[in-house]
Amino acid sequence: MSIPTLKQQANGTVLTLHDKPYIMLAGEVGNSNSSSVEYMEGVWQTAEQLGMNTLLLPITWDQVEPEEGQFDFSLLDGLVLQARGKGKHLVLLWFGSWKNAECMYAPAWVKTDLQRFRRGQIVKGKNKAPRENAYGMLYTTLSYLCEETCAADARAFGRLMRHLRTLDGEENTVLAVQVENESGLLGTARERSDEADVAFAADVPQDFAGYMRSHIETMVQDVQEAVENGATSGSWGEVFGSVAEEIFSAYYISRYVNRVAQAGKKEYPLLISVLLSVTEDITKSIIGIIAHADNTIITQWPIL
C-alpha cells in the first residue's frame, strides 16, 4: 500500500488513502485540546456526533523537544493510537517557530537564548515592542533571518517525521502534516534589525527576480505593476518598488519554511502543506499588520 497522496484524475485532484479516494470530513481542534489524550476523548465524541472522519490537531515543538536534542513523542503516540482505535484519521499541525506569527510554541531553550535564536524586530533594537491596535500588548517573534533557529526547527521536524514513519508508515492514520502556522511577523512589512537592513539593501537573487518577471500574469495588480516597473536587477527596493518589503519578507519566510518541510519529507514523504491567510488583493490587506503567510505573495512559493 502507498502512503496518502494526491492524484490527478479527469475531474480534478483527489486525495487517496491506500490507493482509494478519501474525502476528509474534517474539523480543527482548539490549540490546547490536543495537549492531553484524556481531554481529546470528549473532542472525539463531538467529532463522531458531527459525522467527522478526520481531525486537524497541533503537535508543538515545545512538546516534542523540551530540552535540546531530547525528544519525547509520547503525546504524539497517544494521539495517533487514539485516532486509530476510533477508526479516524489526523492531519498534524506543526507549531514550530511560528503559530499565528508568534513564537509561543517554541521550546523554552529557544525562547530564552536571544543571542543564538534571534528575535524578529518590528522596532529597531527592540526584541519586544507594542503593535498598533494591539491594546499595548508587547509583541515578539522569532527572526526569519536566523540560521540557527531554522536549523533547529528543521532538525526537530525531521525527527518528528522519522518517528511518525516508524509509528504510522503502514497504517497511515496521519494523512498529512502542516508546516508552521501563519509564519512571519506582525506590525511591520519586514524585520527592522540591522541584519535585515543589510539584507534588504543587497541585490535580489537573480533567479528569483527572473522568476517573478516571468510569472507576472499570476499576480494581483499592485504586485504586477511593481514588478513590471521595477529594475531587472538591484536591491529589493529597486526591483520591487512599493511592494518590496512584503516580498522581501515572503521570500525569506518561504525559504525558511521550505527548509523545515524538506527536512521532514526526507524522513517521511507524507503530504506537506502550509497555511495562508487569504486576502483578495494586496491593497485590501494592511501590509505589515497581517502575517506574511499571505496569498498575495503566493507566486513566490514554487521557486522557493
Residue ranges and their predicted role:
Residues 1-53:
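N-terminal carbohydrate-binding accessory modules
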Residues 16-19, 48-49, 85-86, 168-171, ...:
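Extracellular/periplasmic catalytic domains that process cell-envelope and extracellular macromolecules
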Residues 22-26, 54-56, 87-91, 172-178, ...:
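Structural preference for beta-strand elements that scaffold enzyme active sites
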Residues 30, 58-60, 94-101, 178-183, ...:
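Short, solvent-exposed turn/loop segments enriched in Gly/Ser/Thr/Pro and often Arg
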Residues 32-49, 284-303:
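Short, acidic/polar
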Residues 35-39, 68-71, 141, 145-152:
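Extracytoplasmic/periplasmic, Sec-exported soluble proteins
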Residues 39-119, 256-267:
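Aromatic-lined substrate-binding rim segments of carbohydrate-active enzymes
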Residues 114-298:
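Polysaccharide-binding and catalytic clefts of secreted carbohydrate-active enzymes
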